[in-house]
Structure formats: C-alpha cells, structure tokens
Amino acid sequence: MQAVQFAEYGSPQVLRIVEVEEPHAGEGQVRIAVRAAGVNAIDWKIRAGYMGRGRPLGQPSGTGIDAAGVVDEVGEGVSDVAVGDAVFGTGRATFAEYAVLSSWVAKPSGLSFEEAAGYPVPVETATRILDEVGVQPGETLLVSGASGGVGSAVVPIARQRGISVIGTASERNQDYLRSLGATPTTYGDGLVDRVRDLAPNGVDAALDIAGSGVIPELIELTGEPSRVLSIADFGASEHGARVSTSSRNAAGAMAEAAQLFTEGAFTLPVERTFPLEKAAEAQATSEAGHVAGRLVVTVP
C-alpha cells in the first residue's frame, strides 16, 4: 500500500510516499481503509525531531494520528463495530491507504469523511483542557490561538457548556471566531488592555493553544497562575501555570462531539484539503500557522 513516511528528521520535504506492507488489526484494534486523515501540529513536531529528545530516527516512520474511513478488519475482542462501518478515530501512521486505529467512534451519517478526520485530536484536547482548567458555566475564558484546529473545537464546546469565550487570532480570522461564538481580539502588544476592555469583570481562566509566549499576560488577566493552562508552551510551569500533554479519554470526547454534531450543536470546519501526494504541503501549511479550522489529507 501507499503511505507517507520520513527516513530522517527535518523539514516537510523529508516526507515521501512509499510502498509498504499493509498493517493489520491487533487485539482491541480495527483497521480502516482511510478516506481522510487530519493534520495536527504534533505530526510536524514529531517529523521535525522536536519530540525525539536528541535521539536519531532509528527507522523510517509513518506520520499522522487522526483518520476517518471504513472498517475492513476487526481485531480480537472488538464487538462495537463490524467490517463496512464508517468510523473516525486515532491511531498511528494514518497518512496511508490503510491504518490501524486504537480508539474510534461511529461516524454520523451526515458528517463527511473529511470533516470527521479533523475531529479526533482537537476534540479530545479541547474537552480535556476545558475540564483541567476548571472553567465553569457563566465564567469567561480567554483562548490564545483560538482559530486553529484545537481552538476551533474549544470555542463551540465551551459555548455549549455556558462559558463566554474571548479568542485571539489574526485580523483575517476575526470573523471566523465570531462564527464559532467567540468574541475576537488580536494578539500581540496591548493584549492585556484589549481583553480588559472586552471583559470588564475579568477573565476566569485562560488557555494557551498557540505557545506564543503569552503566559505572563494570561496570568495577569486571570490573577492566578493555576487558572492558566497551556498545551504548547512547556515553560509555562516556570510561571506557575499548568501544562497538559496526555490524552485521557479520546473515545469519550469523540463520542461527545459526534453527538453534538448530530444535534446540530457542533461543527469543526475544514479550511483546506490536500491529496496524499501533497502531505508535505499540508504539514508546511500547519506549521506556518494562521489556519482557520482544520487541514485534512484525502486518500483516494
């Protein structure tokens, strides 16, 4: 089968389409014929070697975590799906014609494969960090970097929970944030004053999604380091803020998002799709930032 791999750490240009053996579902897993795969920041961070802790890449590696497709192989112990079912979920090396998923949920009939492929990592991350930061209905949440994949999930889920959201994004993505239900503002110098103008009663909690060095400003706005949480700035703890990195209940988060979609209460827009042969361009676009919604790789 065809799959996207890299044999060395580096820029997006190290990605290649290669012929590899098909994977097979093990115990508690399913294999899907991939229709689409979501692009996440963690994909290019792994490819660039940021997560390798200085160790060399021992062998060629696939890329991609999120995927949507049709089940064509069911592992031992799996009883909630059958061959032919449409699902979306998380696995490894999902930029490929076939991929093995370790966590999945049924794809709602009205949700396209491209849209579904954009759900897994963002919705798991969004629900996890909203729970961890402890923001409650009636409170105000500031989201730094609100227009990307995770931010695009955080905003509507928070709004469904009765939380007011102020989000930062570039000028061109301000209307997009409004469409999600957030009050937009720009990032950069003067952030504290701009947010205070928008939230005279203060900000109750803040999420740093972009990792753009704003932890001190977020702490100033919340008045309490423990009410600031980052998924992108690993130095946040030096300021007393918290960092969240580990997935906890991917299936539960995906099921919640699927149910909200079915009820007409949640969408995660796809900004752009790329064919498998342009996976390098997809990751480069993600790495450049300023994306409004999700980037997705499609598989013929």
Language model features with spans:
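N-terminal glycine-rich beta->alpha transition that marks the start or flank
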Residues: 11-14, 19-68
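A glycine-/small-residue-rich N-terminal strand-loop-strand element
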Residues: 68-91
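Short helix-loop-beta connector
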Residues: 82, 109-112, 134-140
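Mid-domain Rossmann-like dinucleotide-binding core that forms the NAD(H)/NADP(H) cofactor-binding site
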Residues: 119-188
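Glycine-rich phosphate-binding loop and adjacent beta-alpha segment
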Residues: 178, 209-269, 276, 299-300
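Short amphipathic alpha-helix with an adjacent loop that forms part of the alpha/beta core around
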Residues: 191-201
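C-terminal capping/lid region of NAD(P)-dependent oxidoreductase domains
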Residues: 267-269, 283-300
